[in-house]
């Protein structure tokens, strides 16, 4: 499977459930790259169930509130987050690269130093009498390799090769005409020092900022994540490449009309050592993820526009549900079908809701009315979205974790050494000892 956040969480979850997963990644090295990410309480809860609560708390910051503002910085509506909102688990803002490295270290510690292999290109798969045979190419040597496994789980991102094999007629990712510039920089506190702020007006004009670590000293500078969105018009095909490093001048050009009294966006952009430009992409919801012993997970299954802080969190839940299904259902095909049934409807609904701004509909409605919405109306929009994502306080606090109470009952899954993996874009759960490949 891909060695990103979803794939590594899946490996940890499968290992905890008694399986022998192996991870492969197309990139030659896995590095701490990227910008900020938010993990909602239901995702934090699942990482805590994997024994990662202390490690996560050490690298992340629990935000106190989410505030929506107009383009002049005026307040529209705000709500508490995490523990302050009544959840039993916090919400965390964290640098994606640090989260990635935390998960990678946990996988290597628990599954062994060779559990993650890099530089391997997934080429395709075939079904065998005992499972799946996946085909790969080593990027360094060009040599082909094969791997026999119980199941193949593609978590190789929005341009998933596994997804393309399962849905060969799908075509390119969908672009909505919005460009995003993203970066991180040290900056003085904004508002209470723990706020996520989303400022905007019409769709495609938005500035987001939030801290992703505590400052070294009270009142000092913190590391802030920022995102600028500008709509340049519709397009059938997304830009190529899908993301690139750009000079600060490109982002500054989109900030000419922004005036936020509690934040200087220009300064934040100028302080950023690296600025990345992305087109805002998603894909149409799929009617099916699982095909026999092959399935999809994370962005490979449901890439979505970044509204509502849901993408990474839903991928983590995917991983946990998949491991739970494989542990509870002895037939791998039935297990993947059950996973599909449990997850696909929820995340497909989120993908479609995010195309209509998700909870950020609050900003659009305020712009239409030339002023703040009523608190009741804003609360209604936010709650509707949370309910759809199964992320209200009541839904999260009362739903059992996806932890497997007892590891997989077949001892062969835990004790047999299993062959070395050579996959990318897919997770290989190796067959029990004695299985005929």
PLM features: what roles do these ranges have?
Residues 3-28, 153-154, 181, 209, ...:
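Conserved mid-domain beta->alpha element of the FAD-binding
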Residues 15, 40-167, 171-184, 235-249, ...:
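Conserved N-terminal helical subregion
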Residues 31-32, 125, 162-163, 304-306:
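Conserved protein kinase catalytic core
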Residues 31-42:
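Accessory recognition modules or surfaces
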Residues 34-36, 91, 238-242, 307-311, ...:
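Short, solvent-exposed loop/turn segments at secondary-structure boundaries
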Residues 73, 287, 308-310, 324-437:
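C-terminal helical "tail/cap" subdomain of flavin- and related membrane-associated enzymes
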Residues 75-100, 137-147, 186-274:
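Conserved FAD/dinucleotide-binding core of flavoprotein oxidoreductases
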């Amino acid at each position: 499977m891909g060695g990103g956040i979803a794939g590594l969480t899946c490996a940890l979850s499968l290992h905890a459930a008694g399986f022998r997963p192996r991870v492969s990644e197309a990139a030659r090295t896995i590095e701490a790259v990227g910008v900020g990410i938010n993990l909602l309480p239901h995702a934090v809860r699942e990482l805590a169930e994997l024994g990662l609560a202390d490690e996560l708390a050490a690298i992340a910051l629990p935000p106190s509130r989410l505030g929506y503002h107009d383009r002049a910085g005026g307040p529209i509506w705000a709500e508490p987050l995490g523990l302050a909102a009544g959840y039993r688990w916090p919400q965390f803002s964290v640098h994606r690269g640090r989260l990635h490295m935390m998960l990678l270290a946990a996988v290597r510690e628990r599954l062994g130093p060779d559990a993650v292999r890099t530089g391997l290109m997934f080429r395709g798969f075939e079904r065998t009498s005992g499972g799946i045979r996946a085909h790969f190419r080593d990027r360094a040597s060009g040599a082909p390799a094969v791997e026999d496994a119980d199941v193949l789980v593609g978590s190789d991102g929005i341009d998933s090769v596994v997804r393309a094999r399962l849905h060969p007629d799908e075509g390119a990712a969908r672009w909505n005409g919005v460009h995003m510039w993203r970066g991180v920089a040290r900056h003085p506190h904004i508002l209470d020092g723990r706020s996520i702020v989303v400022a905007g007006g019409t769709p495609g004009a938005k500035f987001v900022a939030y801290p992703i670590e505590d400052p070294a000293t009270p009142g000092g500078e913190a590391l802030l994540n920022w995102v600028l969105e500008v709509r340049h018009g519709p397009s059938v095909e997304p830009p190529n490449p899908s993301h690139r490093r750009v000079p600060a001048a490109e982002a500054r050009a989109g900030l000419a009309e922004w005036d936020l009294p509690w934040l200087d966006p220009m300064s934040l952009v100028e302080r950023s050592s690296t600025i990345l430009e992305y087109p805002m992409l998603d894909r149409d919801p799929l009617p099916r993820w699982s095909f026999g012993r092959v399935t999809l997970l994370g962005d490979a299954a449901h890439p979505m526009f970044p509204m509502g802080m849901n993408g990474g969190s839903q991928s983590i839940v995917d991983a946990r549900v998949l491991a739970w299904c494989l542990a509870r259902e002895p037939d791998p095909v039935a297990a993947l079908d059950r996973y599909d049934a449990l997850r696909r409807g929820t995340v497909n609904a989120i993908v479609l809701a995010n195309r209509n701004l998700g909870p950020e509909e609050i900003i659009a409605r305020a712009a239409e009315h030339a002023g703040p919405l009523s608190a009741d109306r804003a609360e209604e929009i936010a709650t509707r979205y949370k309910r759809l994502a199964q992320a209200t306080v009541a839904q999260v606090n009362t739903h059992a974790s996806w932890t497997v109470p007892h590891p997989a009952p077949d001892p062969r899954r835990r004790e047999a050494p299993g062959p070395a993996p050579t996959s990318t874009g897919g997770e290989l759960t190796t067959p029990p000892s004695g299985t005929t490949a």
